[in-house]
Amino acid sequence: MRIGHGFDVHAFGGEGPIIIGGVRIPYEKGLLAHSDGDVALHALTDALLGAAALGDIGKLFPDTDPAFKGADSRELLREAWRRIQAKGYTLGNVDVTIIAQAPKMLPHIPQMRVFIAEDLGCHMDDVNVKATTTEKLGFTGRGEGIACEAVALLRKADK
């Protein structure tokens, strides 16, 4: 078994909506990013790549490459997952923690789980997404941006 950890953060800037976990969430602010700014899928992709020793999302999809400008993070996740599977890994489970003062994530979490399970070709029982605040502390607490952490467990298919 292999464990990977991912982290991502994006600052608010411009107009909303925002995309988190593949879900378009109405909000007055947008997130500044080269791609669609989906902190949840970026952290998850990093966790999966880390568990497979394939580097990170920036190595695979560099923000210096114009091809990834405005990229759909669900497509990036699916491509990373294809590469991970090609190395002989299967999914154990993933756990995602979104850190944001606002907007409220709870109403959107069920759809995030659906999208992640679809993209990874797994059962929803293998996908957990939760959200928390920092009780108005730090940059997320001041409403300056959103952060996310993710953990992934992989298994070698032949073991």
UniProtKB/Swiss-Prot annotation:
Assigned keywords, A-Z: Isoprene biosynthesis, Lyase, Metal-binding
One biological process term in Gene Ontology: terpenoid biosynthetic process
Keyword NADP listed: no
The species this protein was found in: Klebsiella pneumoniae subsp. pneumoniae (strain ATCC 700721 / MGH 78578)
Cofactor(s) needed for function: a divalent metal cation
Highest taxon in the source lineage: Bacteria
InterPro entries: MECDP_synthase, MECDP_synthase_CS, MECDP_synthase_sf
UniProt xrefs under HAMAP family: IspF
Binding site residues for 4-CDP-2-C-methyl-D-erythritol 2-phosphate: 8-10, 34-35, 56-58, 61-65, 100-106, 132-135, 139, 142
Biological role stated in the UniProt entry: Involved in the biosynthesis of isopentenyl diphosphate (IPP) and dimethylallyl diphosphate (DMAPP), two major building blocks of isoprenoid compounds. Catalyzes the conversion of 4-diphosphocytidyl-2-C-methyl-D-erythritol 2-phosphate (CDP-ME2P) to 2-C-methyl-D-erythritol 2,4-cyclodiphosphate (ME-CPP) with a corresponding release of cytidine 5-monophosphate (CMP).
UniProt record similarity statement: Belongs to the IspF family.
Gene3D superfamilies, alphabetized: 2-C-methyl-D-erythritol 2,4-cyclodiphosphate synthase
Annotated pathway: Isoprenoid biosynthesis; isopentenyl diphosphate biosynthesis via DXP pathway; isopentenyl diphosphate from 1-deoxy-D-xylulose 5-phosphate: step 4/6
List of residues binding a divalent metal cation: D8, H10, H42
Lyase keyword on record: yes
Assembly and binders: Homotrimer.
Pfam families: YgbB (PF02542)
Enzyme Commission identifier(s): 4.6.1.12
PROSITE patterns: ISPF (PS01350)
Catalytically driven reaction(s): 4-CDP-2-C-methyl-D-erythritol 2-phosphate = 2-C-methyl-D-erythritol 2,4-cyclic diphosphate + CMP
Protein's recorded name: 2-C-methyl-D-erythritol 2,4-cyclodiphosphate synthase
The record's free-text note on cofactor binding: Binds 1 divalent metal cation per subunit.
CDD domains recorded: MECDP_synthase
Site positions (Transition state stabilizer): H34, T133
